[in-house]
Amino acid sequence: MATNDAVLKRLEQKGAEADQIIEYLKQQVALLKEKAILQATMREEKKLRVENAKLKKEIEELKQELILAEIHNGVEQVRVRLSTPLQTNCTASESVVQSPSVATTASPATKEQIKAGEEKKVKEKTEKKGEKKEKQQSAAASTDSKPIDASRLDLRIGCIVTAKKHPDADSLYVEEVDVGEAAPRTVVSGLVNHVPLEQMQNRMVVLLCNLKPAKMRGVLSQAMVMCASSPEKVEILAPPNGSVPGDRITFDAFPGEPDKELNPKKKIWEQIQPDLHTNAECVATYKGAPFEVKGKGVCRAQTMANSGIK
């Protein structure tokens, strides 16, 4: 009977993990769809810009042809301004002869001005695009240049205000956790088989706050409760005495500011997590550096030494 219970518990845990994987895959598919739509839109925009440029060029050429045709037919070009006023003793025939002459000499200049103006606009647009692209590349480079270590994690002290069973999953709790923000965060944890519900209430915990929010069986989870973990046992990490919600956990050997949100595509959490362990004194560490709340102490597991943390 005990064996059946253990198998059932493992199956429920595997089910919860499978749900997380499915939700993650759904998010990746949605991102790929958005990227494909964006690329198609950009291609269409580029095509339309090329067509617009061709149309503008054709319009200007037709304008010049119209001006020349009017000149040949003796139509005076009203918009052409003469550099010197006509003498009053000019005959009508002289005026007709002079007007085409002036218009003919002015039209190439007008064409060059229009062409120069369009070239200037194209150049300005190209420069603006170049500047924007450089800024985007610079921002991406600054993020990529940050070392992949525990300083990227937004680890904070939280207090579980309420905890209850997930309505659609027997192995999951749904908690409302105070992390020092204006409103509590909703957190879904697979701790039903390891921590009694009454021990979850008003409990101080360590939270990872910058994972991308993900739905777990229909409930959006906005953080993760950090635990010492092994295949047989799980213990919630305990903050040092005197900690309050919102206190930041730092690592002396790994200074730096945490990411606003860990990029799931870059697998930052997945690269850091294998180096999170409790030491022989049950203190939570990253590559030997303790989880520390400045001026208050370190975080630790109750009994689990030399265990992984997740």
Curated annotation (Swiss-Prot):
Stretch list, region Required for endothelial cell migration: 115-190
Expression by tissue: Highly expressed in salivary glands and pancreatic alpha cells in the adult (at protein level). In the embryo, expressed primarily at sites of tissue remodeling such as ganglia, developing bones and teeth.
Stored Pfam families: tRNA_bind
Alphabetically ordered keywords of this record: Acetylation, Angiogenesis, Apoptosis, Cytokine, Cytoplasm, Endoplasmic reticulum, Golgi apparatus, Inflammatory response, Nucleus, Phosphoprotein, Protein biosynthesis, RNA-binding, Secreted, tRNA-binding
PTM notes: Cleaved by caspase-7 in response to apoptosis to produce EMAP-II.
Biological process according to GO: angiogenesis; apoptotic process; inflammatory response; leukocyte migration; negative regulation of endothelial cell proliferation; positive regulation of glucagon secretion; translation
Biased composition (Basic and acidic residues): 112-136
tRNA-binding domain: residues covered: 149-250
Residue numbers spanned by region Required for endothelial cell death: 101-115
Compositionally biased residues, Polar residues: 92-110
Keyword Cytoplasm: yes
Signals that turn on the gene: By wounding.
Knockout consequences: Increased Hsp90b1 surface expression, dendritic cell hyperactivation and development of lupus-like autoimmune phenotypes. Retarded growth after birth, reduced food intake, reduced plasma levels of glucose, free fatty acid, glucagon and insulin, increased glycogen content in the liver, and rapid decrease in blood glucose concentration upon fasting.
Region (Required for fibroblast proliferation) location: 6-46
Region (Interaction with HSP90B1): 54-192
GO cellular component: aminoacyl-tRNA synthetase multienzyme complex; cell surface; cytosol; endoplasmic reticulum; extracellular space; Golgi apparatus; nucleus
Chief localisation class: nucleus
Modified residues (N-acetylalanine): A2
Its biological purpose: Non-catalytic component of the multisynthase complex. Stimulates the catalytic activity of cytoplasmic arginyl-tRNA synthase. Binds tRNA. Possesses inflammatory cytokine activity. Negatively regulates TGF-beta signaling through stabilization of SMURF2 by binding to SMURF2 and inhibiting its SMAD7-mediated degradation. Involved in glucose homeostasis through induction of glucagon secretion at low glucose levels. Promotes dermal fibroblast proliferation and wound repair. Regulates KDELR1-mediated retention of HSP90B1/gp96 in the endoplasmic reticulum.
Protein name (database record): Aminoacyl tRNA synthase complex-interacting multifunctional protein 1
Organism this protein belongs to: Mus musculus
